[in-house]
Each structure stands twice: as structure tokens, then as C-alpha cells.
Amino acid sequence: MRRALIPTVLLALAAAGSLAAAPAAFVYVGAYTHWEELPNHRNPPGGASHGIYGFRFDRDSGKLTALGLAAETRNPTYVAFAPSGRTLYAANEIYQFRGRPAGAVSAYAVDPATGGLTFLDQVSAGGAGTCYVRPDHAGRNLLVANFGGGSVAVLPVNPDGSLREASAFVQDTGSGPNPRQAGPHAHSFNPAPDDRFAIEAEFGTDRLMVYRLDSATGALSPADPPFVAMAPASAPRHFTFHPNGRIAYALGEIDSSITVLAYNGASGRLRPLQSISTLPPDYKGKNTAAEVLVDRAGRFLYASNRGLNTIAVFAIDGAGRLRPVAQVPSGGRTPRGFCLDPLGRWLLAANQDTNNVAVFALDPATGIPAATGETAEVRSAVCVQFLPGLDHR
């Protein structure tokens, strides 16, 4: 098995000339760095990392070439990019920021030639335990979810990609039936395809909260209705739209489920259509689901299972409903985050408890990922993302 080992400093890129003939992309991995800052923290099997790590990815061979530590920062457990690909945003999952109970968000300029990151700024997320960031499609605002604080925020984006203080902040209330749902826990916050609405996956209250989003001002207001209830103790974690913009998918962490929803773009209303397990019928072990993504053609949906340690594959029919296709071993233990190559050829999975990112080739006919044997070592890897919009040769 090939391994791309991480050096402690950003590697010089002159040696990358040998890859010039191959289509390539940059990949970034977020990881836990300070477990002691988390409530009920545990000692990870491989220890903690130091921040965000960069790789060059060859789209012909599936090979990852380590570029090293791209940014040293605390607990960057989720990263996302501006639509232009020129700015990287990291959720700093911390519980104290500048003397207050809050998490933070860091912004970095991306060098399109080298993949290097230049620090722009770091601002408060308003609530503690920041776990998710996502820019709106216009690139005007960054949507933020705070798991520990049970809140969401909107951070306006400056022309250079840096961030301003929150233009909107909403504190959630309520609880759910599972002991892990003793209070509210916002787990993700995503814009609708036209940026008119934003949808929050509220882990603690089993709800998808829907807000009207004013893209010009960054203001939030409740939609009508303001939420759709999910199954009790499902614990909504992540949420994604189908490319057609009329269907959406919500991932339940605790019950390992996917809920298919019809989306009304005029009102923001979500209507459940189907609920399906991410697990095979005969599996009786422990599991929590982590990530859900749809391929760019809208033909296949993927979800990660922590416990079963697989990527679940579903075919999507013309109505957006799901049919199970395969359970593919993730190449390690505890696959938390994974990403899809924007060109539709590859899947990369971050396995938290085996400290690696595994590379899979996607079958264009079946959608099933096939392990390539390529893997990169990153301690406590939890998020992996392709840099969008830029090919590097």
C-alpha cells in the first residue's frame, strides 16, 4: 500500500514539475489538533495533528503528493472554499476564543500556483464548538454552525475573502430524546441553490430549520414554516441538495438514516418523501453516520458510516428517491468526511481513527468506488476537500 507521508513544513514545489503533464488538483485535509479542548474528549489512536494539510492530486493516477502543513490552526475540523476557489475557510472547533465561550472561523488566501495558504483573519463564530462553514453561492456570506453552542451565524465576506463580524446570529432552543440531545446542537448550515434560503441541520432537536437569507445584508429571518421535523432521535447532521435544486437529502447521525425531501424554492418549504437506512439490513453493530454527498450528475448519493466503516452507495431515481447499491469499506476506521472529485472520477475518504485519507476510483456506470491502494497519512483526519474551480498542471 502506497503512503504519502506528511512533512512538518510546506514542501518546495519545484519537484512537482514531473507531474506537469497530468491533470491535477489541490486537496486539503482538516484534522483535530487539541482534543483536550473538547467536552468529553478522548485520546485519539494516532495523536493529534497541527492544522490543515495540503496535497497535489493527480487526476490520471489518483496519486496524492504531500505538500505539508499548509496552515497551523486549532481544530480545523471542517474546511470549505469560496466559489472562486481563491479563499479557504476553516471551522475552528474550539470552546474559548479571545476569553469568551465561542468558536472561531479562519480565512486563508489560496495561491493558485502552489496551493499555499496565506492567513487573512480569524473571527468569532458567536457560539462554541464551531463545526461547519459554507459560503453562499454568490460568495457574499459565510454560513456557520456551532455544535457546542447550538447556534448559527452569518459572517459577511470582504472583497479580499476576509471576514467581518456576524451580521446574523440565531441561538437554538430545545432538546431531543437521546442523551446526546440534551440541548440544541447546530451541525451544518447550507444555502439553498439560489441563496434565498438557508437550511440548518439541528442535531439536538431533530429539526431542519429554514431561514430566509438576505444575501445583500447577511440577515436571517424564519421561513414559513420555520422548520420541518425529522424522526425522533435521528439527530440531523448534514444536508445537501440534488443538482436539480428540487430535491434535498438530510443525514441522521444517530439513527444512520437519509431523509429525502422535496424542496419548494419559492417558499423554502421542505417535504419528506422517503427515509432509508445507511446500513445493510443485517448489520446489528454500533454506527453513526457522518457525511452525505450527491455526485455532480445527480445519479448517485454517498454516505459514510462510522462503526461499519463503509461508504454507502445509493442510486437516485428520476423522483430523487434512493435505492441501495453497495457498501464499500472506507479504507480505514471511522470515515468522518469524504469528498468527490469535481470531474466525477474520484472519491477521497478521511478515516479519523486510522489517521489516513484513502483514494477510490468511481465507476461511471455503477457509481461504486473502487479502492486504489493510494493513501495519505494525516493524524485525526476528519475533513477532506478538493479545491474547486482550478486545475493545476
Predicted regions and their residues:
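A short beta-strand motif characteristic of beta-propeller blades
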Residues: 65-71, 118-123, 174-179, 223-229, ...
